[in-house]
C-alpha cells in the first residue's frame, strides 16, 4: 500500500487529531448525531484504527510500518514502546518535532530536497534513524535558510519535546536521548497496534 496523498481533513475526521499529518483539527459532531449513529465497534476495527493513526501520523506505508513492528519484536523491551521510539527517531519526524517543518510530509520534503544536514552531512533519506548526540542543521543556502525560518516562525507555539533541544537563532537541533513514552506527540494505544500485527509480524 502506497503513502496516502488524498484529503487530510477526511482522515482526521475519522481518526482524530494527527499533528504529524496536518495542523488542522477535525470538527466535532454534535452529541445527538453521535448517539443516532452509535454502533458497537468490533475489537478488530479498534485495533485497525489505532494502526491507521500511526501510519497516517508518521506518513509511512503499510509495508514500512510492518517492518518497524518486526524490528521492535526482535528488540529487548516493550514492543509497543520500541515501535514508537523507532518511528519518533526517523529524521523526518525529528525535523517536524524541532519545529523546522509544520507537518511530517513537509519535513519529508525538506529532507528529500537536501535542505537538512545531520552531523554536518546532507542526509536526503526521511527514514534515516537519528540517535543521541546527532545534530540537525540546515544547509547554508539562502533558499534553505528562508524556508526553515518561515517554518520556525509558524511553529513557535509548538513545544520542543524533552529529548530534543533547538536553537532557533542558529537553526540547530540536537537529539539528547531516546525519547520516553510521555514525549510522544500523539494520542495512541500502541499495544493495540502490536496486537493488530500479531499474526503478520
Curated annotation (Swiss-Prot):
Location(s), subcellular: Plastid, Chloroplast
Keywords: Chloroplast, Plastid, Ribonucleoprotein, Ribosomal protein, RNA-binding, rRNA-binding
One annotated GO biological process: translation
Upper lineage: Eukaryota, Viridiplantae, Streptophyta, Embryophyta, Bryophyta
SUPFAM superfamilies in the record: Alpha-L RNA-binding motif
Similarity annotation: Belongs to the universal ribosomal protein uS4 family.
Organism: Physcomitrium patens
Origin superkingdom: Eukaryota
Gene Ontology, cellular component aspect: chloroplast; small ribosomal subunit
Pfam families reported in the protein's UniProt record: Ribosomal_S4 (PF00163), S4 (PF01479)
InterPro entries per UniProt: Ribosomal_uS4, Ribosomal_uS4_bac-type, Ribosomal_uS4_CS, Ribosomal_uS4_N, S4_RNA-bd, S4_RNA-bd_sf
Assembly notes: Part of the 30S ribosomal subunit. Contacts protein S5. The interaction surface between S4 and S5 is involved in control of translational fidelity.
GO MF annotation, one: structural constituent of ribosome
Transmembrane segments: none
Its job: One of the primary rRNA binding proteins, it binds directly to 16S rRNA where it nucleates assembly of the body of the 30S subunit. With S5 and S12 plays an important role in translational accuracy.
Protein's recorded name: Small ribosomal subunit protein uS4c
S4 RNA-binding domain ranges (all copies): 89-150
Amino acid at each position: 500500500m502506497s503513502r496516502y496523498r488524498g484529503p487530510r481533513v477526511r482522515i482526521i475526521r475519522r481518526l482524530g487529531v494527527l499533528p504529524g499529518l496536518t495542523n488542522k483539527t477535525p470538527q466535532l459532531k454534535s452529541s445527538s448525531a453521535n448517539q443516532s449513529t452509535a454502533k458497537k465497534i468490533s475489537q478488530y476495527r479498534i485495533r485497525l484504527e489505532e494502526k491507521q493513526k500511526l501510519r497516517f501520523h508518521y506518513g509511512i506505508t503499510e509495508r514500512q510500518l510492518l517492518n518497524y513492528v518486526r524490528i521492535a519484536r526482535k528488540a529487548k523491551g516493550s514492543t509497543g514502546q520500541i515501535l514508537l521510539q523507532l518511528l519518533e527517531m526517523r529524521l523526518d519526524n525529528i525535523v517536524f518535532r524541532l519545529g523546522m517543518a509544520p507537518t511530517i510530509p513537509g519535513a519529508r520534503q525538506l529532507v528529500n530536497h537536501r535542505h537538512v544536514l545531520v552531523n554536518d552531512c546532507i542526509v536526503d533519506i526521511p527514514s534515516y534513524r537519528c540517535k543521541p548526540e546527532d545534530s540537525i542543521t540546515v544547509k547554508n543556502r539562502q533558499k534553505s535558510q528562508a524556508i526553515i525560518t518561515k517554518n520556525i516562525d509558524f511553529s513557535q507555539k509548538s513545544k520542543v519535546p524533552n529529548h530534543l533541544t533547538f536553537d532557533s537563532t542558529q537553526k540547530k537541533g540536537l537529539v539528547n536521548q531516546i525519547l520516553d513514552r510521555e514525549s510522544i506527540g500523539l494520542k495512541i494505544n500502541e499495544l493495540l497496534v502490536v496486537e493488530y500485527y500479531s499474526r503478520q509480524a
